[in-house]
């Protein structure tokens, strides 16, 4: 766990000095100090472990004639600290891969501009019949919580170092609350909040950089940890071997791009027939997002991956980076079967989860993921065309056995479960799940945060609380303050505002924002004319 913390935390913070550097006003300091020195000095004063400080300080390879070789090069540490040197190598290599994914090589007619800003990735999108935008558009370096819209570079060119200074002062204030004990996921959340609109580098050519520092740090952490897992699984000795050459290989298929997709979403949400069905739609829509989150949590735990490895998870789909090891591939297959067995018990054949993986090299990551994305998509399409084939093959008799037809729920039409009173009209009986979805839909507009309960922890919910269990993970939704035990919490209304000490994992969950209206009737009343939606 200590090594994982050093690798992941060191990778997440390896370029923190870039933000500090840009916030400084004295050119003399900038001339004498490099960003890795400034970052390491801050990390040491903040109380981070020495290994993390050294990762930040020495994550660039230097020539032996560099005047700061002894201070900043990983090789200068010598063979006495091979474990640390290898850890620095793996972060440095991941940094190089991430940079290759994001930018052209330094050289040519470019120049460094510490006050350059981030360019929107959609700047090159040209609508049919429209002229491309000629003037450079930029994001101002602001927090993710601020309203930020792309503007012409000429409109916002002044006072940029002051904006960087504000960003750093606020980020530093939050990090210093518990720098040594901060959870990986909380650190990632804070970096997203403060570096989402900060460019990863300041080397300018014709185009401004369009990759954020946040995404660079996140990618570096993901690649570094997956590289470490791959090498250890293939027999390297981290503490006794000099692994620089092994770490630097770019032609081995060391990584897996894992893709997942949930089938049956539209029918799950909308194919409902009864007077109470509409009141379950909000809850069902949210539930699917929570289901994907639970699957992601299950995969990360089973594969021993940090959340930095999650590329995307929403809308019924997920993508993540994993090491290409036999154990990882077996785990991916096992988790898929585990999820589908659970889905079958809960919903019959209504929902099915496809999960596939495609190997890729370090060179492939740096070069571009287009072909790999395509192959993952093709594999998912094939997998979705043969739903339940494993389950049918393994247990044909049970899968096609007669099922009880009594106690059919009038909303979802699932049978065989004891019906309970409908939360809105008690004389109307529905299955327990549909009743929960109605309650969830009622609670969501008033929930600003919800909690993931510790495994095995029994919490007695209050009358206004709702506890949902998804894939064996219990989530507590409450309208009131909750100070009980929690394995982590999800921020809904204010996605980046920490509510607990930094050692408690925090995640944002903006897809749960339902604060505009509690009911469709309320939305209708806000309109003009006939009381119809869309009229």
Language-model-detected regions and their locations in the chain:
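Bergerat-fold GHKL/Histidine-kinase-like ATPase
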Residues: 92, 103-257, 264-313, 321-535
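Structural motif
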Residues: 10, 257-259
């Amino acid at each position: 766990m200590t090594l994982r913390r050093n690798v992941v935390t060191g990778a997440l913070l390896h370029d923190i000095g870039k933000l500090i550097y840009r916030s400084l006003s004295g050119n003399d300091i900038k001339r004498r100090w490099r960003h890795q020195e400034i970052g390491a000095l801050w990390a040491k004063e903040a109380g981070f472990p020495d290994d993390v400080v050294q990762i930040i300080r020495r994550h660039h390879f230097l020539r032996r004639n560099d005047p700061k070789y002894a201070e900043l090069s990983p090789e200068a540490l010598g063979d006495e600290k091979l474990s640390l040197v290898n850890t620095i190598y793996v972060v440095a290599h991941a940094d190089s891969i991430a940079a290759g994914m994001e930018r052209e090589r330094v050289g040519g007619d470019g120049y460094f501009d510490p006050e350059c800003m981030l360019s929107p990735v959609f700047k090159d999108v040209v609508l049919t019949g429209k002229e491309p935008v000629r003037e450079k558009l930029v994001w101002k370096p602001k927090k993710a919580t601020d309203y930020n819209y792309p503007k012409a570079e000429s409109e916002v060119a002044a006072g940029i170092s002051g904006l960087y200074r504000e960003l750093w002062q606020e980020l530093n204030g939050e990090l210093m609350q518990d720098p040594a004990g901060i959870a990986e996921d909380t650190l990632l959340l804070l970096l997203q909040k403060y570096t989402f609109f900060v460019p990863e580098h300041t080397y300018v050519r014709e185009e401004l950089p369009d990759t954020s520092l946040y995404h660079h740090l996140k990618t570096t952490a993901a690649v570094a940890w997956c590289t470490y897992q791959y090498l250890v699984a293939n027999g390297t000795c981290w503490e006794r071997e000099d692994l620089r050459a092994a770490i630097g290989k770019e032609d081995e298929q060391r990584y897996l791009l894992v893709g997942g997709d949930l089938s049956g979403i539209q029918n799950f949400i909308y194919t409902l027939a009864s007077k109470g069905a509409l009141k379950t739609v909000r809850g069902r829509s949210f539930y699917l997002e929570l289901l994907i989150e639970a699957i992601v949590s299950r995969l990360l735990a089973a594969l021993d991956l940090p959340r930095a490895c999650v590329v995307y998870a929403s809308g019924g789909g997920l993508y993540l980076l994993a090491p290409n090891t036999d154990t990882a591939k077996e785990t991916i297959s096992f988790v898929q079967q585990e999820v589908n067995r659970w889905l079958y018990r809960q919903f019959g054949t209504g929902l099915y989860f496809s999960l596939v993986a495609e190997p890729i090299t370090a060179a492939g990551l740096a070069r571009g993921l287009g072909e790999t994305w395509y192959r993952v998509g093709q594999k998912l399409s094939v997998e979705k065309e043969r739903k339940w084939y494993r389950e049918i093959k393994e247990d044909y008799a049970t899968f096609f056995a007669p099922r009880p037809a009594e106690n059919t729920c009038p909303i979802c039409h699932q049978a065989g479960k004891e019906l309970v009173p409908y939360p809105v009209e008690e004389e109307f009986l529905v299955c327990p799940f549909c009743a929960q979805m109605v309650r969830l839909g009622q609670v969501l507009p008033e929930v600003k945060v919800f909690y993931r309960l510790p495994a095995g922890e029994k919490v007695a919910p209050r009358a206004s609380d709702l506890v949902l269990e998804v894939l064996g993970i219990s989530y507590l939704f409450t309208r009131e303050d909750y100070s009980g035990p929690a394995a982590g919490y999800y921020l809904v209304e204010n996605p980046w505002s920490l509510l607990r000490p930094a050692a408690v994992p925090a995640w944002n969950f903006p897809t749960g924002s339902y604060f505009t209206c509690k009911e469709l009737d309320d939305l209708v009343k806000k309109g003009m004319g006939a009381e119809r939606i869309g009229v």
